Amino acid sequence: MKILGVSLGTKNGNNDTMCRVALEAAKEKGAEIEFIHLLDWDIQYCSGCVACSRGLVMGKGMICSRQDDFKAFYEKVVEADGVLFVDPIFESGATGLYHSITDRMGPGHDTGMMKMLDGKLKEAGKEGLNPRYFRQKAISFVGIGGSDWAVRCETDHAMFALSPGWKVVNNEFFSWCKDVIMQDDKVERMKEIGRNLADAAQQIIDEDMQVEGSEKTFSLERKRRCLPHCQGNNFYIYPGTTHCVCELCGLEGTLEIVDGAFKFKYDPATEHHAHDILSGKFLHGQDIFENEGRLMNLYKDPEFKKRKEHYTAVCEPTPAPSKQK
């Protein structure tokens, strides 16, 4: 059983240290451990070229136009049975680097779309994708903040697990953490998070758990949260209404007070649309396939070309100072 720890903080700073605290605890449970300081790796931002989604829905393979370390990083994550991310909290949320790896995960590594690609490859008489891409994985997140600005980081962090459909064990943040290594309660909690992750990873191995079929059968430690489906706790409330949508899984409903706490009420008949389960991913993949098809046809449309040419000619972009001679 292998546990990978990934820190996105300064070298040997609080995030690195707390990640290693959890890894040490996982090692004591029998895990093989590995540590990555992600700032040492060349990870570029997603350009939005959609080569990945087109490659998947058209059966061409897993494609990315960026030439950097992300593919190697993704393979490291896939090889592990459990993964822990420890990320500094920037302006209440995840770091820019963390957002970049989340953007790079989806849709190019979305399990639903990869299943579609796997089927297309096999239909064409070719070898399908490596089965390990469809194996379930335990994943945990910890945000480390210097103050109490932290309430967006849990949703930001969980987005990384959304595309592959991996199981989130713990998703937490620690505030006021400049001296966190001296705060015994938080150090002990990190040890517990490491042990929880090792236990969940071992359960996945023992049950040979795949992403498909394990969406509602995995019992993990949870906090009391508003939405029992994805354990989301952040919602967009439509102005002037009681209608809201979970920022994580996309289910829509209303917030109600039950036993002194907010609970999210939604129609169970809509659950198949949720972004974190395969049925919702297949729907999303079909939407992308149809939209890409419409766009490809538009490229042949004279009116489309005319409008593109008109607005492209309105103004030129200002050159980047670093690229000027």
Cite the ranges covered by each PLM segment.
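Active-site-adjacent alpha-helix of alpha/beta-hydrolase-fold enzymes
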Residues: 21-29, 153-167
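Short, histidine-centered active-site or binding-site loop motifs used for metal coordination
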Residues: 7, 143-145, 173-175
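Helix-loop-strand module that forms the ligand-binding subsite of alpha/beta enzymes
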Residues: 61-161
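Catalytic cores of secreted or luminal carbohydrate-active enzymes
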Residues: 181-192
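N-terminal beta1-alpha1-beta2 submodule of the flavodoxin-like/Rossmannoid cofactor-binding fold
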Residues: 1-102, 106-107, 197-198, 202-325
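A charged, well-structured terminal subsegment
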Residues: 163-171, 191-208
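Active-site rim beta-loop-alpha module in soluble metabolic enzymes
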Residues: 176-180
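Short beta-strand elements in bilobed, periplasmic/extracellular small-molecule ligand-binding domains
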Residues: 32-35, 166-175
